[in-house]
């Protein structure tokens, strides 16, 4: 199946195996974005700058590098971040009745990791003056010192994303951000990301794993698409359309079927093509049936 592997890889790039890592990230950088420079002066004193930078990349958790912790509005407990809360409070080890997730936009209080002062959500600690997150989103209540992620806030999605705003666009019909390479080529599916992955059932819109947009417009985790490939599954789990260019595979199947004698010359069946939607009446074959319109073997009897 080497040829199919190459085809799937090529299609994944063409159809936006863009990183749609949809976790909330930065709207504002106090230290670099002049548009939001309400808390800095024209000439920053070297001592003040040194204070802002104190402890950068030294605090945080497995999910974020940040210099604060959050108080969860739902259970009033303190966690390093929203994910840390959800991993603890939404675990299978917790009573199902008590499981819950933290509503990111409702966080009101943060605790400075350097001085321990609890305060309302803000970028600079009111007590010690340290910047608690080089990138800060007041809407998503997100703090992150790792600016290499190229965080940006999408008003359409209502959350922040990573990868650089210039590399993505928001599709109003699909209801999510896609790679700019898909702007004029993707198939729109209403609410394409607002559902669970058809393989692992994780909610795609808030998933921290990479998501791929299939030619049919449906979405799936990249890792799940790879697992499908490993098991020789090349049809969308939702609509059954081919997930990549299968023309070479169909040509090979033509050659193989030509060597197999057919003992049902007089039997005809009607088929529906999963790729183009056309119906055909073709000679019955034990192995596969070919669409008379698009020549695909991705068909079913009707």
Curated annotation (Swiss-Prot):
One GO location term (cellular component): nucleus
Broad class of where this protein is predominantly found: nucleus
General function of this protein: Possesses transactivation activity in yeast cells. Involved in the regulation of stomatal aperture. May modulate the expression of genes that control stomata opening during heat shock or drought stress.
Protein name according to UniProt: Probable E3 ubiquitin-protein ligase RZFP34
Zinc finger (CHY-type): 54-130
Gene Ontology BP annotations: protein ubiquitination; ubiquitin-dependent protein catabolic process
EC number: 2.3.2.27
């Amino acid at each position: 199946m080497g040829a199919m592997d190459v085809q799937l890889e090529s299609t994944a790039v063409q159809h936006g195996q863009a990183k749609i890592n949809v976790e909330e990230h930065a709207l504002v950088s106090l230290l670099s974005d002049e548009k939001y420079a309400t808390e800095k002066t024209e000439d920053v004193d070297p001592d003040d700058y040194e204070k802002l930078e104190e402890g950068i990349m030294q605090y945080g958790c497995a999910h974020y590098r940040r210099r604060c912790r959050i108080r969860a509005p739902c259970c009033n407990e303190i966690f390093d971040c929203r994910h840390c809360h959800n991993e603890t409070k939404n675990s299978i080890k917790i009573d199902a009745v008590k499981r819950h997730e933290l509503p990111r936009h409702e966080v009101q209080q943060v605790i400075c990791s350097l001085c321990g002062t609890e305060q309302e959500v803000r970028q600079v600690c009111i007590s010690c003056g340290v910047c608690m997150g080089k990138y800060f989103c007041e809407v998503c209540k997100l703090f992150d010192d790792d600016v290499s992620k190229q965080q940006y806030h999408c008003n359409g999605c209502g959350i922040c994303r990573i990868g650089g705003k210039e590399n993505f666009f928001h599709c109003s019909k699909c209801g999510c951000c896609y790679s700019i390479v898909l702007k004029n080529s993707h198939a729109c599916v209403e609410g394409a990301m607002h559902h669970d992955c058809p393989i692992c059932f994780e909610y795609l819109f808030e998933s921290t794993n990479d998501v791929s947009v299939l030619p049919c417009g449906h979405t799936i985790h990249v890792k799940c698409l790879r697992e499908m490939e490993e098991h020789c599954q090349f049809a969308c789990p939702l609509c059954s359309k081919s997930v990549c260019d299968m023309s070479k595979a169909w040509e090979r199947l033509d050659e193989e079927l030509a060597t197999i004698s057919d003992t049902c010359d007089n039997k005809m069946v009607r088929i529906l093509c999963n790729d183009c939607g056309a119906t055909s009446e073709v000679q019955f074959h034990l192995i596969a049936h070919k669409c008379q319109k698009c020549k695909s073997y991705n068909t079913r009897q009707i």
